[in-house]
Curated annotation (Swiss-Prot):
Protein name: CDP-diacylglycerol--glycerol-3-phosphate 3-phosphatidyltransferase
Pfam families per UniProt: CDP-OH_P_transf
Residue ranges crossing the lipid bilayer per the database entry: 14-38, 62-82, 88-108, 147-169
Domain of life: Bacteria
UniProt-annotated location(s): Cell inner membrane
Amino acid sequence: MQFNIPTLLTLFRVILIPFFVLVFYLPVTWSPFAAALIFCVAAVTDWFDGFLARRWNQSTRFGAFLDPVADKVLVAIAMVLVTEHYHSWWVTLPAATMIAREIIISALREWMAELGKRSSVAVSWIGKVKTTAQMVALAWLLWRPNIWVEYAGIALFFVAAVLTLWSMLQYLSAARADLLDQ
């Protein structure tokens, strides 16, 4: 296995995850800002590793596997942390919706790949918008410098949940013929 800069960025994102969790729970006033900063750095590497892999023609099978895994683990852990912090339905409901969608679509992609139809459920533009809304909302909910940022984060978290459902319906619609084929 050959390591290149895009793959190393993805590995760096994975390595940041335990530090992100530890910093989140530090009993100091700067903990929310530091946790949000670590999350943002990790989120930027998610965009940057894919960009560099395509730009430098350094895509690898290992990188293609690890990138979505690192992304989903980072986001799921961030959702668990903000859900635990807020301990209210208005954060838990969108988080549960987004986590459920990721499980459903991951299973759908795997199944479609077995059928040789992976491109039928490739990432769409709405998925990219959803991811952006999700990352920004999570960063705001982690940072929470004031009540207005928290309200904006919760509102954007709901927007991300709606986009999550929309993109899931698009993926299921694209795979409908195969899903219903007996």
